[in-house]
Amino acid sequence: MSNTDALNTANTQITENVDTSSMKVEKTHDSDPMKITNTSFALEMTQHLFEDLVAHGYKNIVKHEVYPGPIIDLQNLVRVMTKGTFIPIKMEDIKDLHDFVMDRLSEFDCSCLGHLCPKEYMIQIWKAGRIQSEFYYCYNYQLQDLSQIYPFVIEWILKRDDMPLNLDKESYEATALMMSKLLESLIKFGNEKIEFVKFYKLCGHIQCPCEKKPASYLDVKKLVGVLTDGGIIGFEGLTKLYVHLEKSIQEIDDRWSHWLPGRTRKPIYYKTFTKGRVTQLSIKCYSFYLQEIALIAYVVTQFILQEKPDLSYRA
């Protein structure tokens, strides 16, 4: 595909008019006009985790009473991903959660099994009118195992409401590896490595002397670099990725068919060397926000695994 063809593909507009006056945001069934897949609900929980990691690091997902540590606490992970609205406190729920995650790690033959071992832990619960100590077994999950663990915790949460999550065994390890790079970046640098900041005049007048205000957006090109440990995606690959993003997010959550037309397409500039000189090309596409990292990162990883775009690396 030539640069011109790629640019034309990226500039394809959605022409269908959508009436947003009757838009529904609640969970719907197949017969309803708006279809929200279970993957969308899973990604909402993933977004809660990402935001908590940026704000607090690992503080809210570890076992504070365990030494030496830190050890990931699955109950705390559930609490963070559901924003404190669901906390497993019944012993049968706690045991079921840990058994489920351990079984899934074994079923998917996850690499973290090489250094994990089951250990006995204690939890204090209120039972029969007094505080009692109960014991349960689980793996001593390390911080570097988070990307392999949290999808199964989400799967367990959704399973309780009969909402199956179809995780792909074949791509799970590669996906978890890419997500581990993103988690590491969020912990160390916050959103710094995946954002770009634009400055706007609130009045909207370019010549006005009033102060410009910053607005942060998700930089998809930088996100690819983080997920692939420094990979640089070319203009053609980035163009295809934006087209893929627009299509895939609507398949995951039909509400995007209403939300996207409400956003302005803006040019993303890309410098490339062609015909003996440096040329600046542009891709006209929708902007995405930092609160959409989980969704966009998921689609980007699937694109990388399925389409295998050319990536270059600096020596």
From Swiss-Prot:
Residues 1-31 are annotated as: Disordered. It comes from the Viruses. It comes from Acanthamoeba polyphaga mimivirus. This is Uncharacterized protein L859. Residues 1-23 have a biased composition (Polar residues).
